[in-house]
A protein has these predicted regions:
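Short, conserved catalytic/metal-binding motifs centered on acidic residues
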Residues: 43, 58-59, 70-76, 116-126, ...
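Active-site-proximal, Lys/Arg-enriched surface segment
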Residues: 76-157
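An internal, acidic/charged active-site-proximal segment
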Residues: 91, 167-281
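A conserved active-site cap/scaffold subdomain adjacent to cofactor or substrate pockets
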Residues: 280-307
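Short amphipathic alpha-helical "interface-anchor" segments enriched in bulky aromatics
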Residues: 297-325
């Protein structure tokens, strides 16, 4: 991709540079004179970054790169556009290989995971839009009310790229859609993430994904695997030990057993029992994957939590809690803009660390304090050093309030690159580069 020679003029131009580099390869581009695709993409991300309470509030002060305003009608009409949605979706998809090229992959250190595409998946809900209709659940005596907007996302565990799967489609009279119903609706190639031939996809999902027949089909047809936690009411029958745990290998600390069991429906499933050395909490994992070591599956599932932390980032720190508009396209657009914003923040933060040598020293000091006061279990567990699984990832699972507030200010004021670095150095408590 061509390098933007002027990407360091302002923090605004640096932040949007990956988007500008990716756009020429995107699907369904169109040169709209009133609101170009790039202006629209920047507009949506800026809306996510803004502290404004509504779209009208945001548009009253927003200016495009040429200092012109965006009409309210233009913005909300653009949110309905199927073509713009296709373009936005493809740009965010293009950021996935872009992030793989630019961000570190801590999981690359695990040789067994070569050629694996690793995802944490989950649903997340927003409050209904202002003009969403009220509905009444079937056979309910309650007054009609608005339904929340449900979205399903996947987080790439290698790069933390956030991708969008689908909008929830609740049955008539219901307020939400079951995760499994959404998964079954997807094209299997989409779930593979268009992984190359010979590669495999692995989903870490919560208990809502359990349907052994569906995952057997996904595995047989497209090389898609899953792991989840066992339900408390699951009925399984022991078949045989799958592997013997080698306790001389520090990576196996906490593993109790690795077995094959039979579900009540007759499916052979791998069951891994693990006790967290730090807390003594027992976990039982179920998976249809039979080539990876048990410790790898435990490690991956432990970091399924990263997608929950990402939702916290978007809801609590970006304050994206409510749908922007009522149309299905607009709701999907909103979710894709949230993904794009998260991904651009990750790229900018890494650039500042790698290129400018900047790091959040305030957060590092807070982490030390948290570690001292964090509950570490009782008895002998209090003095145990962190296990291999518990200390593997060093990366942050979300961006801090300090970073987001600094970025929000720099984007709105179009602060110069050098001044932005000075402001961030003050915020992070680190030297000015």
């Amino acid at each position: 991709m061509a390098h933007n020679q002027h990407h360091k003029d302002t923090i605004h131009s640096l932040f949007f540079n990956p988007l500008i580099e990716s756009y020429p390869l995107s699907d369904s581009p169109f040169d709209c004179p009133d609101l170009s695709d790039l202006d629209f993409l920047k507009l949506g991300v800026s809306r996510c970054m803004s502290a404004a309470r509504s779209g009208n509030d945001f548009l009253q002060t927003y200016r495009k790169d040429d200092e012109s305003r965006v009409r309210v009608s233009n913005f909300f009409e653009a949110l309905k556009s199927p073509r713009r949605l296709a373009n936005l979706t493809s740009v965010n998809a293009l950021l996935k290989p872009y992030m793989a090229d630019h961000l570190p992959d801590e999981l690359a250190a695990i040789e067994e995971l070569k050629n694996w595409h690793l995802y944490a998946g989950d649903g997340h809900y927003h409050k209904a839009a202002v003009f969403d209709p009220k509905t009444k659940a079937n056979h309910s005596s309650k007054e009609p009310s608005k339904s929340p907007t449900g979205h399903f996302f996947r987080l790439d565990l290698r790069t933390q790229h956030l991708g969008y799967l689908d909008l929830a489609q609740p049955d008539d009279g219901k307020k939400s859609e079951h995760d499994l119903k959404m998964l079954k609706r997807q094209d299997l190639e989409t779930l593979r993430g268009n992984a190359p031939k010979g590669h495999k996809a692995f989903y870490l999902w919560d208990r809502a994904c359990i349907d052994y027949g569906f995952w057997a089909k996904a595995k047989a047809q497209k090389g898609i695997y899953f792991a989840t936690l066992e339900k408390s009411n699951s009925v399984t029958t022991f078949i045989r030990e799958f592997s013997i745990i080698d306790y001389d290998d520090c990576r196996n600390e906490g593993l109790i057993s690795d077995r094959l069991v039979e579900s009540s429906a007759g499916y052979e499933i791998r069951q891994i029992v693990y006790i967290d050395p730090a807390t003594g909490t027992e976990y039982r994992y179920l998976t249809n994957e039979k080539t990876l070591p048990a410790w790898v599956i435990v490690l991956l599932y432990k970091h399924r939590w990263d997608i929950e932390k990402t939702f916290d980032e978007t809801k609590t720190k970006l304050e994206e809690k409510k749908s922007w508009a009522s149309s299905r396209n607009a709701k999907k657009m909103h979710a894709n803009f949230i993904c794009l914003t998260h991904n651009l923040m990750l790229l900018l933060e890494h650039h500042l660390h790698k290129t400018e040598g900047m790091k959040d020293e305030v957060e590092e000091r807070k982490q030390v304090t948290r570690e001292k006061t964090r509950h570490k279990g009782t008895g002998f567990r209090k003095n145990l050093p962190p296990s291999y699984i518990n200390r593997f990832f060093q990366r942050a699972s979300q961006r801090t309030f300090r970073f987001i507030r600094w970025l929000r200010d720099g984007l709105s004021r179009r602060t110069s690159y050098r001044q932005s670095l000075r402001d961030l150095a003050h915020t992070w408590g680190c030297p000015v580069p």
